[in-house]
Protein backbone atom coordinates (compact mmCIF):
# COMPACT_ATOMS: atom_id res chain seq x y z
CA UNK A 1 0.00 0.00 0.00
CA UNK A 2 1.48 3.30 -1.10
CA UNK A 3 0.09 6.29 0.78
CA UNK A 4 2.49 9.15 0.09
CA UNK A 5 2.26 11.92 -2.47
CA UNK A 6 4.64 11.61 -5.45
CA UNK A 7 7.01 14.35 -4.28
CA UNK A 8 7.62 12.47 -1.01
CA UNK A 9 8.34 9.26 -2.93
CA UNK A 10 10.74 11.11 -5.22
CA UNK A 11 12.87 12.02 -2.20
CA UNK A 12 13.29 8.37 -1.22
CA UNK A 13 13.56 6.95 -4.71
CA UNK A 14 15.32 9.66 -6.67
CA UNK A 15 17.12 7.31 -9.04
CA UNK A 16 15.69 4.49 -11.14
CA UNK A 17 18.07 1.87 -9.73
CA UNK A 18 16.87 2.41 -6.15
CA UNK A 19 13.24 2.46 -7.25
CA UNK A 20 13.66 -0.80 -9.20
CA UNK A 21 15.44 -2.51 -6.28
CA UNK A 22 12.61 -1.68 -3.91
CA UNK A 23 9.76 -2.53 -6.26
CA UNK A 24 10.98 -5.66 -8.07
CA UNK A 25 9.85 -8.08 -5.35
CA UNK A 26 6.35 -6.63 -4.92
CA UNK A 27 3.49 -8.32 -6.79
CA UNK A 28 0.88 -5.53 -6.55
CA UNK A 29 0.85 -1.93 -5.44
CA UNK A 30 -2.31 -0.44 -3.96
CA UNK A 31 -2.70 3.31 -4.15
CA UNK A 32 -5.37 5.59 -2.70
CA UNK A 33 -5.66 7.85 -5.72
CA UNK A 34 -5.18 8.04 -9.47
CA UNK A 35 -2.37 10.63 -9.34
CA UNK A 36 -0.19 8.22 -7.38
CA UNK A 37 -1.07 5.36 -9.73
CA UNK A 38 -0.01 7.48 -12.72
CA UNK A 39 3.21 8.48 -10.96
CA UNK A 40 4.17 4.84 -10.31
CA UNK A 41 3.44 3.90 -13.91
CA UNK A 42 5.57 6.77 -15.21
CA UNK A 43 8.37 5.53 -12.92
CA UNK A 44 8.28 2.24 -14.84
CA UNK A 45 5.83 -0.04 -13.05
CA UNK A 46 3.60 -2.06 -15.38
CA UNK A 47 -0.05 -0.91 -15.33
CA UNK A 48 -1.24 -4.37 -14.25
CA UNK A 49 0.95 -4.16 -11.14
CA UNK A 50 -0.75 -1.00 -9.81
CA UNK A 51 -4.30 -0.96 -8.43
CA UNK A 52 -6.13 2.23 -7.49
CA UNK A 53 -8.44 1.80 -4.52
CA UNK A 54 -10.01 4.26 -2.10
CA UNK A 55 -9.38 5.36 1.44
CA UNK A 56 -11.77 3.94 4.02
CA UNK A 57 -13.55 5.89 6.71
CA UNK A 58 -14.39 4.38 10.06
CA UNK A 59 -18.12 4.26 10.82
CA UNK A 60 -17.30 6.12 14.03
CA UNK A 61 -17.08 9.34 12.00
CA UNK A 62 -20.50 9.09 10.41
CA UNK A 63 -22.52 12.08 11.58
CA UNK A 64 -26.13 11.55 10.50
CA UNK A 65 -27.46 14.92 11.57
CA UNK A 66 -24.85 17.65 11.75
CA UNK A 67 -26.09 20.46 14.00
CA UNK A 68 -24.52 23.89 13.86
CA UNK A 69 -25.27 25.92 16.99
CA UNK A 70 -22.80 28.81 16.79
CA UNK A 71 -23.24 32.31 15.40
CA UNK A 72 -20.09 32.65 13.27
CA UNK A 73 -18.94 30.12 10.72
CA UNK A 74 -16.41 27.69 12.16
CA UNK A 75 -13.79 26.22 9.84
CA UNK A 76 -11.50 23.33 10.70
CA UNK A 77 -8.19 22.82 8.89
CA UNK A 78 -6.62 19.41 9.48
CA UNK A 79 -3.80 17.38 8.00
CA UNK A 80 -0.33 18.82 7.88
CA UNK A 81 1.27 16.75 5.12
CA UNK A 82 1.58 18.89 2.00
CA UNK A 83 -0.56 21.65 3.54
CA UNK A 84 -0.30 24.99 1.75
CA UNK A 85 0.42 27.02 4.86
CA UNK A 86 0.89 30.29 2.96
CA UNK A 87 -2.58 30.01 1.39
CA UNK A 88 -4.10 28.97 4.73
CA UNK A 89 -2.62 32.08 6.37
CA UNK A 90 -3.99 34.29 3.57
CA UNK A 91 -7.47 32.79 3.97
CA UNK A 92 -7.39 33.30 7.75
CA UNK A 93 -6.17 36.89 7.39
CA UNK A 94 -8.86 37.71 4.82
CA UNK A 95 -11.72 36.28 6.90
CA UNK A 96 -11.60 37.88 10.36
CA UNK A 97 -15.30 37.10 11.03
CA UNK A 98 -14.76 33.37 10.57
CA UNK A 99 -13.52 31.22 13.45
CA UNK A 100 -10.76 28.77 12.50
CA UNK A 101 -9.68 25.64 14.33
CA UNK A 102 -6.30 24.70 12.92
CA UNK A 103 -4.80 21.33 13.74
CA UNK A 104 -1.06 21.74 14.12
CA UNK A 105 -0.19 18.07 14.28
CA UNK A 106 3.36 17.85 15.60
CA UNK A 107 4.24 21.38 14.41
CA UNK A 108 3.97 24.55 16.48
CA UNK A 109 2.19 27.17 14.38
CA UNK A 110 1.61 29.65 17.22
CA UNK A 111 4.10 32.22 15.90
CA UNK A 112 2.59 31.94 12.42
CA UNK A 113 -0.93 32.83 13.61
CA UNK A 114 0.11 35.02 16.55
CA UNK A 115 -1.92 38.06 15.46
CA UNK A 116 -5.03 36.12 14.42
CA UNK A 117 -7.62 36.33 17.20
CA UNK A 118 -10.00 34.19 15.13
CA UNK A 119 -7.74 31.12 15.31
CA UNK A 120 -7.73 28.27 17.81
CA UNK A 121 -4.62 26.13 17.38
CA UNK A 122 -4.80 22.57 18.62
CA UNK A 123 -1.87 20.16 18.92
CA UNK A 124 -1.97 16.53 17.91
CA UNK A 125 -5.03 15.08 19.67
CA UNK A 126 -6.64 11.69 20.08
CA UNK A 127 -9.33 10.70 17.58
CA UNK A 128 -12.23 11.28 19.98
CA UNK A 129 -11.16 14.87 20.60
CA UNK A 130 -10.54 15.46 16.89
CA UNK A 131 -14.01 14.13 16.12
CA UNK A 132 -15.48 16.61 18.62
CA UNK A 133 -13.67 19.50 16.92
CA UNK A 134 -15.05 18.28 13.59
CA UNK A 135 -18.56 18.05 15.04
CA UNK A 136 -18.28 21.70 16.11
CA UNK A 137 -17.19 22.86 12.64
CA UNK A 138 -19.24 23.91 9.62
CA UNK A 139 -16.54 23.64 6.97
CA UNK A 140 -13.48 21.48 6.38
CA UNK A 141 -10.81 23.62 4.70
CA UNK A 142 -8.19 21.59 2.85
CA UNK A 143 -5.61 23.81 1.20
CA UNK A 144 -2.92 21.50 -0.08
CA UNK A 145 -0.02 21.38 -2.48
CA UNK A 146 -0.81 17.74 -3.32
CA UNK A 147 -2.90 14.86 -2.01
CA UNK A 148 -3.71 11.22 -2.49
CA UNK A 149 -6.40 9.42 -0.50
CA UNK A 150 -6.70 11.23 2.78
CA UNK A 151 -8.29 10.35 6.08
CA UNK A 152 -8.92 14.09 6.56
CA UNK A 153 -11.01 14.19 3.39
CA UNK A 154 -13.04 11.03 4.02
CA UNK A 155 -13.69 11.78 7.69
CA UNK A 156 -14.78 15.34 6.81
CA UNK A 157 -17.23 13.97 4.26
CA UNK A 158 -18.54 11.41 6.77
CA UNK A 159 -19.01 14.14 9.38
CA UNK A 160 -21.22 16.09 6.97
CA UNK A 161 -18.90 19.07 6.76
CA UNK A 162 -19.02 21.43 3.81
CA UNK A 163 -15.81 20.91 1.86
CA UNK A 164 -13.40 23.47 0.45
CA UNK A 165 -10.42 21.79 -1.21
CA UNK A 166 -7.47 22.61 -3.41
CA UNK A 167 -7.87 20.98 -6.81
CA UNK A 168 -4.64 18.96 -6.64
CA UNK A 169 -3.48 15.37 -6.89
CA UNK A 170 -6.21 12.77 -6.47
CA UNK A 171 -8.73 15.06 -4.79
CA UNK A 172 -11.33 14.49 -7.52
CA UNK A 173 -11.32 10.78 -6.67
CA UNK A 174 -13.11 11.87 -3.48
CA UNK A 175 -14.48 15.39 -3.98
CA UNK A 176 -16.04 16.97 -7.06
CA UNK A 177 -18.44 19.78 -7.94
CA UNK A 178 -21.34 17.85 -6.40
CA UNK A 179 -19.88 17.90 -2.87
CA UNK A 180 -17.01 20.39 -2.75
CA UNK A 181 -16.12 23.99 -3.51
Describe the residue ranges of each PLM region.
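Acidic anion/phosphate-binding donor-loop and adjacent secondary structure
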Residues: 11-13, 41, 56-72, 86
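Short hydrophobic faces within alpha-helices
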Residues: 156-157, 164
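Membrane-proximal helix-turn-helix segments that form the acceptor-binding/catalytic region
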Residues: 7-29
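Conserved catalytic-core segment of nucleotide-activated headgroup transferases in glycan assembly
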Residues: 70-114
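Donor nucleotide-sugar binding/catalytic pocket of nucleotide-sugar-dependent glycosyltransferases
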Residues: 27-41, 46-63
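Short acidic/histidine- and often glycine-rich active-site loop of Leloir-type glycosyltransferases
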Residues: 168-181
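Acidic donor-binding loop of glycosyltransferase active sites
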Residues: 135-148, 161
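Nucleotide-activated donor-binding/catalytic signature segment of Leloir-type glycosyltransferases, i.e.
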Residues: 104-131
